[in-house]
């Protein structure tokens, strides 16, 4: 059977280990959550067909390891990305403080043609933990960070409960489309599958 021609949009998810990158991806693609996911080794990806404005395209979502020893894999995985999703745990100040490092790492490794306008989306995950009583990063602080980076969209999610995950990825898909360089590829009818972690989201200014 001949392959179908689709528009492929590549999305990279970055953030510290344990913030819920895998769970977010799996909740969005497979509508599933598990506490049993192992740490991602290197990188993995899932794909999902999405329809937007009467167009069908394939969203290829890359889940990368948060451990520093795997960051050297970045060039191969980051190149060609149409959108970068930065994820932190609202219950971990360190994961929030490391966002600048992840953003800079991506810009260096991916070398986008227009770094000033490259689309990023920020997700504050695990808002469900301890009913929010363990939270250490306020929504105000996160939005201030987004404002300092050119008013990038911000969502607060729970991959476990599924809160705002769909909304966040709808925004991510729109930003990926708007980023311009859509890559037309011939893809087989089979779809790769990957892994998962935790999250949730709020408002998008797309």
Curated annotation (Swiss-Prot):
Q: What is the effect of changing residue 67 to L?
A: Constitutively active form (GTP-bound form); targets almost exclusively to tonoplast
- What membrane topology is annotated for this entry? Lipid-anchor
Task: Report the residue ranges where the short sequence motif Effector region is annotated in this entry.
Answer: 37-45
Per UniProt, where does GTP bind?
Answer: 15-23, 63-67, 125-128, 158-159
What does the UniProt keyword field contain?
Answer: Endosome, GTP-binding, Lipoprotein, Membrane, Methylation, Nucleotide-binding, Prenylation, Protein transport, Transport, Vacuole
Q: Which residues carry this modification: Cysteine methyl ester?
A: 206
Record Pfam families = Ras (PF00071)
How activity is controlled: the entry says: Regulated by guanine nucleotide exchange factors (GEFs) which promote the exchange of bound GDP for free GTP. Regulated by the MON1-CCZ1 complex which serves as a link between Rab5 and Rab7 protein families in PVCs and mediates PVC maturation.
A biological process (GO) of this protein is:
vacuole organization
| Keyword Lipoprotein carried by entry | yes
Give the UniProt entry's GO cellular component terms.
Answer: cytosol; endosome membrane; Golgi apparatus; nucleus; plant-type vacuole membrane; plasma membrane
Q: Does the keyword Transferase apply?
A: no
Subcellular location field: Endosome membrane; Vacuole membrane; Prevacuolar compartment membrane
Q: Where is the lipid attached (S-geranylgeranyl cysteine)?
A: 204, 206
Annotated effect of mutating residue 22 to N: Dominant negative (GDP-bound form); loss of targeting to the prevacuolar compartments and tonoplast. Inhibits vacuolar trafficking and forms enlarged prevacuolar compartments
Q: Name one GO molecular function term.
A: GTP binding
Write out the function statement from the record. Answer: Essential for trafficking from prevacuolar compartments to vacuoles. Involved in the trafficking of newly synthesized protein to vacuoles. Essential for plant growth. Participates in the recruitment of the core retromer components to the endosomal membrane by interacting with VPS35A.
Family according to the record: Belongs to the small GTPase superfamily. Rab family.
Quaternary structure and interacting proteins, as annotated: Interacts with VPS35A.
Protein known as: Ras-related protein RABG3f
Organism of provenance: Arabidopsis thaliana
Q: Which gene encodes it?
A: RABG3F
């Amino acid at each position: 059977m001949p392959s179908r021609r689709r528009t492929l949009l590549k999305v990279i998810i970055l953030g510290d280990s344990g913030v819920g990158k895998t769970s977010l991806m799996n909740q969005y693609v497979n509508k599933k959550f598990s506490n049993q996911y192992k740490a991602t080794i290197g990188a993995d990806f899932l794909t999902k067909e999405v329809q937007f404005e009467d167009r069908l395209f394939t969203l290829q979502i890359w889940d990368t390891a948060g451990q520093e020893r795997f960051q050297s894999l970045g060039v191969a995985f980051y190149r060609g990305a149409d959108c970068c999703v930065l994820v932190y745990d609202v219950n971990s100040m360190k994961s929030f403080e490391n966002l600048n490092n992840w953003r800079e790492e991506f810009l260096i490794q991916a070398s986008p043609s227009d770094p000033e306008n490259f689309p990023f989306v920020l997700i504050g995950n695990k808002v469900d933990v301890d009913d929010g009583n363990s939270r250490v990063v306020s929504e105000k602080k996160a939005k201030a960070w987004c404002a300092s980076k050119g008013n990038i969209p911000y969502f607060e999610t729970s991959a476990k409960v599924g809160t705002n995950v769909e909304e966040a990825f709808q925004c991510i898909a729109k930003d990926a489309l708007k980023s311009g360089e859509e890559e037309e590829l011939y893809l087989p009818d089979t779809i790769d599958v990957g892994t998962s972690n935790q999250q949730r989201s709020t408002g998008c200014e797309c």
